[in-house]
UniProtKB/Swiss-Prot annotation:
Keywords for the protein's UniProt record, in alphabetical order: Cell cycle, Cell division, Cell inner membrane, Cell membrane, Cell shape, Cell wall biogenesis/degradation, Magnesium, Membrane, Metal-binding, Peptidoglycan synthesis, Transferase, Transmembrane, Transmembrane helix
Name of the gene: mraY
Protein's name in the database: Phospho-N-acetylmuramoyl-pentapeptide-transferase
Catalytic activity: UDP-N-acetyl-alpha-D-muramoyl-L-alanyl-gamma-D-glutamyl-meso-2,6-diaminopimeloyl-D-alanyl-D-alanine + di-trans,octa-cis-undecaprenyl phosphate = di-trans,octa-cis-undecaprenyl diphospho-N-acetyl-alpha-D-muramoyl-L-alanyl-D-glutamyl-meso-2,6-diaminopimeloyl-D-alanyl-D-alanine + UMP
Family assignment from sequence similarity: Belongs to the glycosyltransferase 4 family. MraY subfamily.
Annotated PROSITE patterns: MRAY_2 (PS01348)
Length: 368
């Protein structure tokens, strides 16, 4: 019998959305429980990451059974781009704006369990700010019954504005002498940036929120990978920043509860309401905890998705001929669509991206 390559094994593995949901949820819950045990934290302690994860999950899962039918009644259906994969056209009409229940469900337990920390409130506000920007975009799409929301320039200005105000608040709380000016790196290294840290922080917030937005293109993809990264950050920060770790795990639980309704075949999409908030929250956590390199590694999938779009657009423009048409590096960008058009099923792509994200999260401990 001929040996089977890794590529062939992945192509032959065809999980269901339900299998992916239960596998990811069980794995993240087990990892969070193990961290609690390692730190000798009881289940009902306010510092229990498993409690935060469970509460966020329960609230989002229950809320979804009420909100999803409501979104259907108000005809909050997704408009599918005609130039996208043809298999996605059957998703037209699936309710969007699912972030309106995933985000509050993930934030509420964090504020109850760790609300004494001003940083937790700041993280909650910046998450809600990006959710509001996303909601405005989603609402305009639904209102005009096409795939065009608010203008890209306005959207970007609002994202930069929210990032600037968040960083300004951090500076006001810490004072100019106490602000973060040095980035911690793996292997005990550090990089002194002085005040240049803050333009980098603003850029990180805007770019990460757009990166998660680009990743939100398949059932369960952004929600599952986002929950994994949030849980990974929570595990990383639990010993030194338990309040921020609680925020991470609570929001991770909210997205896992949302994933119950968003797994393939999706009953609801998170929309920009959820995807912009997800990226904004992850970036804000990395900024306040000064673990930008951890974000870069754990969220490597989001970076790859963004790079695939940048390369596709740049190459197309660079090779544009007299007829106005250029060449493409990928069949379609982002990367997940390239794999789809190459014959991969949605669940195969999602399973592979879950696995990649979990490997990247685990690799952080090797780099530390």
């Amino acid at each position: 019998m001929a040996p089977v390559s890794w590529g062939q094994a992945l192509r032959n593995y065809k999980p269901t959305g339900q299998q992916l949901f239960f596998s990811l949820t069980a794995l993240l819950a087990a990892a969070v429980w193990g961290r609690d045990r390692q730190l000798d934290i009881g289940l009902f302690s306010p510092q229990s990451q498993l409690l935060a994860l469970g509460l966020g999950f329960s609230l989002a899962a229950i809320a979804g059974y009420w909100v999803v039918p409501l979104l259907r009644r108000i005809k909050a259906g997704q408009f599918i781009r005609e130039d996208g994969p043809q298999s996605h056209l059957q998703k037209a009409g699936t309710p969007t704006m699912g972030g309106i229940f995933a985000i509050p469900a993930g934030l509420l337990p964090a504020l109850i369990l760790a609300g004494r920390s001003p940083l937790v409130w700041a993280l909650a506000f910046v998450t809600l700010a990006y959710a509001t920007i996303g909601w405005l975009d989603d609402w305009q799409i639904l209102r005009h019954r096409n795939n065009k929301g608010i203008s890209p320039k306005l959207k970007l200005c609002l994202q930069f504005g929210a990032a600037f105000l968040f960083c300004l608040w951090l500076i006001s709380q810490q004072g100019w002498q106490g602000t973060i000016t040095t980035i911690t790196l793996p292997f005990g290294w550090s990089l002194a940036l002085s005040l240049l840290f803050w333009p980098l922080a603003v850029f990180t917030l805007v770019s990460e929120s757009n990166a998660t937005n680009l990743t939100d293109g398949l059932d369960g993809l952004a929600g599952g990978t986002g929950a994994a990264v949030l849980a990974g950050l929570g595990l990383w920060l639990a010993p030194q920043d338990p309040a921020i770790a609680t925020f991470c795990c609570s929001l991770a639980g909210g997205f896992l509860g949302f994933l119950l309704h968003n797994r393939n075949p999706a009953r609801v999409f998170m929309g920009d309401t959820g995807s912009l908030a997800l990226g904004g929250a992850i970036a804000a956590i990395a900024i306040v905890a000064n673990c930008l390199w951890v974000l870069l590694v754990m969220g490597g999938l989001f970076v790859l998705e963004s790079i695939s779009v940048i390369l596709q657009v740049s190459y197309y423009k660079a090779t544009k001929g007299p007829d106005g048409k250029g060449k493409r590096l990928l069949r379609m960008a982002p990367w997940h669509h390239h794999l789809e058009l190459g014959g991969w099923s949605e669940t195969q792509v999602v399973a592979s991206f879950y696995g990649l994200t979990l490997l990247l999260i685990a690799s952080c401990w090797l780099l530390n």
